């Protein structure tokens, strides 16, 4: 079985993330969406909340599971018997960071490949950070995130 890991903070999950996931499920027999528990980004939502926001949005994919991880990504991938890691590239500016991460992961575990997937161009400027900033200032995020995520952001920021 061809199994991959789609890791991220997903803080919160966006339509861009889901677009990359939709592309990954066409390439692999199983995709594990892996929510990073401890991240230097200082997430707004707990890993349990991020998983809860992801779950209803991945049910349309029968070959997807969602979990969290708190280890080196390649160690987690090996433990899950995955053969690859999926990373979304929105713009060329993402490439340098992702390239260095892919090389480090290959150095740590050469059996795990990194596959770069580009989302639909309509999502190329969407990031979780921007979505949180828009929500914090009362902007409409409904074009960027699923309804349950928009509601969670509204609950945190007290805005609509």
From Swiss-Prot:
Which GO terms fall under molecular function for this chain's record? ATP binding; pantetheine-phosphate adenylyltransferase activity
Concerning CDD domains, the annotation shows: PPAT
Which coenzyme or cofactor does it need?
Mg(2+)
- What's one GO-annotated cellular component? cytoplasm
The compartments listed are:
Cytoplasm
InterPro entries reported in the protein's UniProt record: Cyt_trans-like, PPAT, Rossmann-like_a/b/a_fold
Any keyword Transferase? Answer: yes
Major enzyme class: transferase
Q: What does this protein do?
A: Reversibly transfers an adenylyl group from ATP to 4'-phosphopantetheine, yielding dephospho-CoA (dPCoA) and pyrophosphate.
Record-linked HAMAP family: PPAT_bact
UniProt name for this protein: Phosphopantetheine adenylyltransferase
> Per the UniProt entry, what species is this protein from, by scientific name?
Opitutus terrae (strain DSM 11246 / JCM 15787 / PB90-1)
| Organism phylogeny | Bacteria, Pseudomonadati, Verrucomicrobiota, Opitutia, Opitutales
